[in-house]
Amino acid sequence: MDETLYIPPKPNSLPAVIALIRSLWKGDGNLLELLPAEAYHFDIGHLGRSRRGTVLFNRPSAVKEIMRDEQGVFPKSDLMVGALDPLIGESMFVTDGPKWRRQRTMIDPAFSLMRLSVAYVAMCAATDDHVSTISESADSGQPFSLDLAMSHLTADVICRTVFSTPLASNVAKEVFEDFTLFEKSVAQVDILGMILKPAWSEIKQTREVLAACERIRYHIGALVDTHLNVTEGKFNDIASAVIQAKDKDTGLPFTRDELIDQLGVFFLAGHETTASALTWVFYILAERPEWLARLREEIDPYMSDGDLSFEATKKLPLTRAFFKEALRLYPPITFVPRVALEKVEIEGKRLPRGALVMIAPWTLQRHSKYWEDPHAFKPERFLPENEKNLTQGAYIPFGQGPHLCVGAGFAQVESLLIMSQLVSKFDFELLPNQRVVPAARLTTRPAEQVMMRVRHRAQSNAAPTHLITSRQTV
C-alpha cells in the first residue's frame, strides 16, 4: 500500500471476547468494535462464539440473494423490529412482505424526479439559512459541533421539503439529543442479541428511552396534523403526496398513526443518515484541505450568487465521487440484520431456523477482495471512467434491489448542494486534541461530537464571474 495514502479513522480490531467485554463495559453500543480483523477478508463468517452466533455475509452475490428475498425466507429480524418499534412503529423500514409492498407502492410516487426538482427550492432555502448561521460562526471564530450543525441543517431540509415548514433550532437540538440516546440504547440491545442471546429475544427499552421516543413522535405528529387540518391543495410537498396516496386495492389512505410511522421514518432516516455522511465529508475536508482546492475548481463555475442550480448537481463528477467515497468508508447504515425463518442454504452455507444473518455495508465496502487499498480515502475510484470497473454489488450504502432506499436520490442531491455551498464559502479546521472514532449504532457517527471552526474563504479564491450560471427555480 502507498504510505502517502490517507487512512481516515476506524476502530482497531480486537479479539472477540476482549472486544465484547470492552463494549459492554463502556456501554456505548459501538458495534464496530466487535468486528474481528478477518471480517474484512472472509466471504462468510461468524460474529460471536455461540452456535447461534450471527452469520456475516460479505459475498456480493449472497448479499443480493438475501436482500432480494424472493422466497420470503429472510425478513427483518425481530431484534431490529422490536428495538425500533417505540420510535417508528410499522413503517416500511421494518415491515416485510405484502405490508411492505403496499407501503412502498403508496409512497414511491412522492419521491419522483418531478417532486425532487420541486423540493430542491426548499433545500436551497434551508441551506441558505444555515450558511448564514455558519457565517456568523466564522465571524466570531467560535467553535461549534459539526455533528449537531449537520443534523440541524439536514433536519431543516427534511422539514421544509416534507412538511413545508422550517425546523426551530430548539426542536432540532431536542430531536438530536433524543435520537442519540435512542440509538445508543438500540445498539446495546443489538450487541446482546447478536452475541449473547437468541435472535428472538424480547426487546425492552428504559423509561428514559421510551420518553425520548414519545417526544420525537410528538413533534412529527404535530407536523402531520398541520397537513391533515388544512384544505387539500394548500401544500405541494412530500407529506401532502403521502397523505393523498391511496391503497390500489382498497382505495384507503394511510391512517394518522401510519402517517406518523411513515413520515417519521422519512424525517429520522432522511436527516440522520445524511447528517452522518456530511459529518464525515467535512471532517475529511478539515483533515485534507488540499481537497478543497480540487472541489472548488469543479464547483465554482456553477455557482451564482452563492447558489447551485438543480441541473448543476448533475455536472459535478469529482464532488459526487468525494461524497460516494465518504459513503463507502462510512455507510450511514452500518449493519442490516435479517433472520432465517426456516432452514436454508445460501451459497454453501447452511443456516438453521432462527439464525441471525447480518449484511454489513461497513465490511463489504472495505473488503480486501473487492477494493484496492480498502481503508484508504480515494475518491477517484468513483469517477465515471473508473466506477465501471468496480465490483458489482460491493457498494450498497443505500441498500439494493426492491429495498433500495426510497430517498437515495434525494439524499445525494441534498448532499451535493450542501457540499457545494459550504466548500465554496468556507475553510474548515478541527479543534486540536480530539480523538475521532466512528461508532456504529443506528447510523455511523463519531463516538463523540466533533468540534470545528470555520473561516471565510479568501476572496482571491472566489468563483470566476464570467462562468457563473443562474439558479434553476422549478
What is each model feature region?
Residues 22-42, 218, 222, 306-347:
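Conserved cytochrome P450 K-helix E-x-x-R motif and the immediately C-terminal K′/meander segment
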Residues 1-11, 76-81, 115-276, 294:
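Cytochrome P450 heme-thiolate monooxygenase catalytic core
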Residues 359-387, 467:
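Conserved cytochrome P450 K-helix/beta-meander segment immediately N-terminal to the heme-binding cysteine loop
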Residues 273-292, 296-298, 409-424:
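Cytochrome P450 catalytic-core helices
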Residues 10-14, 120-124, 175-181, 232-240, ...:
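Cytochrome P450 I-helix active-site segment
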Residues 1, 7-8, 39, 127, ...:
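Cytochrome P450 proximal C-terminal region
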Residues 1-102, 122-129, 204, 212, ...:
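N-terminal membrane-proximal hinge/A-helix region immediately C-terminal to the signal-anchor transmembrane segment
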